[in-house]
UniProtKB/Swiss-Prot annotation:
Gene designation: cbbL2
Modified residues (N6-carboxylysine): K194
Protein name: Ribulose bisphosphate carboxylase large chain 2
Cofactors, names only: Mg(2+)
Lineage of producing organism: Bacteria, Pseudomonadati, Pseudomonadota, Alphaproteobacteria, Hyphomicrobiales
Note: The basic functional RuBisCO is composed of a large chain homodimer in a 'head-to-tail' conformation. In form I RuBisCO this homodimer is arranged in a barrel-like tetramer with the small subunits forming a tetrameric 'cap' on each end of the 'barrel'.
A Pfam family per the record: RuBisCO_large_N
Amino acid sequence: MAEKSYQAGVKEYRKTYWTPDYVPLDTDLLAVFKIVAQAGVPREEAAAAVAAESSTGTWTTVWTDLLTDLDYYKGRAYRIEPVPGDDNAFYAFIAYPIDLFEEGSVVNVLTSLVGNVFGFKAVRSLRLEDIRFPLAYVKTCGGPPNGIQLERDRLNKYGRPLLGCTIKPKLGLSAKNYGRAVYECLRGGLDFTKDDENINSQPFMRWQHRFEFVMEAVHKATSETGERKGHYLNVTAPTPEEMYKRAEFAKSLGAPIIMHDFLTAGFTANTGLANWCRENGMLLHIHRAMHAVLDRNPMHGIHFRVLTKCLRLSGGDHLHSGTVVGKLEGDREATIGWVDLMREPFVPENRARGIFFDQDWGAMPGVMPVASGGIHVWHMPALTAIFGDDACFQFGGGTLGHPWGNAAGAHANRVALEACVEARNQGRPVEREGREILTEAAQHSPELKIAMETWKEIKFEFDVVDKLDTGPMLRVVNA
């Protein structure tokens, strides 16, 4: 019988994957998980189990460990911190060598970090809170097809946020009536209109007909206003082949921008479409449909800041970011944090905004945040203050719900935006003086006056479910 050269059986994960003395390398991919361990499982063991299952480990010792340099390839749980205000949960910091991941593949990174490990019995709940992508890995990814500056250059629009509108009702309109709504909104002063996330190619409106009527409206509004206009044509489809077919047709009609539902369609499809857009001079708007399934539970899933980083690597020129003030979930400081991750070339660690690591994007272009969901003219001062210029504000019901029609709703939003930008440029505190600023502008715009009257009582004041963990950040002394 051959002599054993390893110890068979099951051993504690922490004997291999808990390395409290490890100092992460600049080339390591770093992740922080929020963990609630099962009763009786030590925190170091739970953290090590996550590191093992998301890298090289399995449930028992295997002899093939001897055929590789396991000490190099393994994930390392190197730090544990408490979660403020929660005695059961803790943060586990894990470092992964960059060679564990295929270059330029968000798919491969997520398959490791949020794959089988999320069903692990050793933990009651698990949430991926943040990732530090090393610059060496960032450089292997394509990123946004165009970026904020190139988009502004193509549109010839500077010094203010862009304005958009999601056409409503989201389902049921004929292609001709849909195109009519697009034309009225663009003629009234908006920069963009948009397909909703679930508009694809349904019996009431096939995608070819929608594309044709919409682009007729875009060209007509562009000609009449002298401003460059666009509509986010949703090319999300059942297959990649069909997706590219729709993208090519949009290009043939002169569309400047197309749209993709990146989570429901998947990162493989999204990265491929981003590459196509880069090669074909097309802007790419990204909708985040399905994100709340993954990110809203504060104890289990993937935080949206992680999805934001992954999208920037995969590719997209716009991404829905939440509004803070509208109908959709969004903590203010957390939202500002992931907006910075979308736009800035370097974002330092900032626990007050939920950012656990420095993130260096190198020369990768930024993604324009899109504030959309339950917003109207009364929100314009806050939106201007929160997002600044490099953002797109999308008013669906806040445009189409105007008593005088779509064009009037668009005009009201444009007047409100320009009033807020002018006030900000004059040094006025826009958010604090928002009511006064809008009231002054409404004296010269009956459309804005009616919009303000229509939505003066509409607020979405619900408590945020996914709040930032707050309190003193005390580091646990490693045992």
